[in-house]
Regions:
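Cleavable N-terminal export/targeting peptides
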Residues: 1-43, 277-280, 294-296
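Short loop/turn motifs that connect adjacent beta-strands in outer-membrane beta-barrel proteins
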Residues: 36-45, 112-117, 180-193, 257-261, ...
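Surface-exposed strand-loop-strand hairpins of Gram-negative outer-membrane beta-barrel proteins
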Residues: 56-71, 87-94, 239-241, 277
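Outer-membrane beta-barrel pore domains and translocons
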Residues: 52-56, 88-92, 109, 121-127, ...
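Outer-membrane beta-barrel translocator/channel fold
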Residues: 57, 62, 119-174, 178, ...
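Repeated loop/turn-to-beta-strand initiation elements of outer-membrane beta-barrel proteins
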Residues: 81-86, 114-118, 150-157, 182-185, ...
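Outer-membrane beta-barrel "beta-signal"
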Residues: 175, 281-296
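Transmembrane beta-strand segments of Gram-negative outer membrane beta-barrel proteins
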Residues: 40-55, 81, 195
Length: 296
């Protein structure tokens, strides 16, 4: 009953801008213009290097770092502040080989007018063969996003598709409110804040085991299980599938910005709304720290 009320209370809060009118899909931070705020000038070519740390990597409703801290290095090429191509290498604590998996990303964004923008992205997660049983199988994710600037809030509606051993669709709705301090250091730096709330929708599978009835979520890069690997004995029988709310999360990114670098810290609170005992994303706080430096 508590989960039921929480789901619809969260939905009401997140849909508030729609009521007033009737204020991303890689977990690796990437440089690039948030289309809710305008770049001061257009640069034809740009190149960035970056690195970051996180206490846990949650992606599409589940932990793909197996609840381990992670670190990463990244290089990103940008064209006209609209098209970005990046490659990231991720290290997980206590995992061999040292680089546990790689992420390739291609993103495009375009501002249509003062209140509407569109973007598209495709992401490839590649893991060494020796870790496919431990972590996940290789998969590709693509999404299309529309952004709406309501002045008080900035809203994103995203539709995405996962291509792996089991293809599936996702829907995300995110509200954020970007603001920044006056510039300092002779107009060369500022501190920005971008608090947000996000709803993730995806395929939920209700199953029966010998012990109980549970709701599982399809997880990226992991084929749906007929046997529960948590104890090795219970047989899982799927009874129904539905498209519903998988997760609610809230975050507060704080960034120090200059002309040539951005250093960002983020605290994120994750609230999963299903009870998969094997691959469930953890409930609670996650911390992330990243830095990007402009080479040219």
């Amino acid at each position: 009953m508590k989960i039921f009320l929480l789901r619809y209370l969260s939905l009401l809060i997140l849909l508030l801008p729609a009521g007033v009118l009737a204020q991303n899909s890689s977990k690796i931070s990437l440089p690039g213009a948030d289309t809710s705020k305008t770049e001061s000038k257009t640069v034809r070519h740009s190149l960035y290097s970056g690195a970051g740390y996180g206490s846990n990597m949650i992606y599409l409703g589940s932990t793909i770092s197996q609840n381990q801290p992670y670190g990463y290095g990244n290089i990103t090429y940008g064209f006209r502040n609209q098209l970005y191509a990046s490659v990231s290498a991720v290290h997980l604590s206590g995992t061999d080989p040292f680089l546990a998996f790689y992420i390739g990303a291609l993103n495009y964004s375009h501002v249509i007018n003062s209140w509407l923008d569109i973007s598209a992205g495709i992401y490839r997660y590649q893991v060494p063969r020796s870790l496919t049983d431990t972590l996940f199988s290789n998969f590709t994710y693509g999404d299309l996003t529309m952004g709406f600037d309501w002045k008080l809030l900035y809203s994103k509606l995203s539709v995405g598709g996962l291509f792996s051993e089991e293809n599936q669709a996702y829907f995300q709705f995110r509200n954020s409110r970007y603001f920044q301090t006056p510039e300092f250091f002779k107009g060369k730096a500022n501190i920005s804040f971008d608090p947000y709330a996000n709803l993730l929708f995806g395929k939920l599978i209700e199953v029966e085991t010998t012990a109980e009835t549970s709701v599982f979520a399809s997880t990226p890069g992991r084929k749906w299980r007929q046997n529960d690997t948590s104890n090795g004995t219970s047989t899982i029988t799927p009874t129904s599938e539905r498209f519903g709310i998988m997760e609610v999360d809230f975050g507060l990114p704080v960034a120090f910005n200059t002309d040539f670098m951005t250093i960002e810290a983020e605290v994120n609170y994750v609230l999963p709304l299903y009870n998969d005992p094997v691959y469930r994303s953890p409930k609670g706080f996650i911390f992330m720290l990243s830095g990007f430096f402009r080479i040219f």
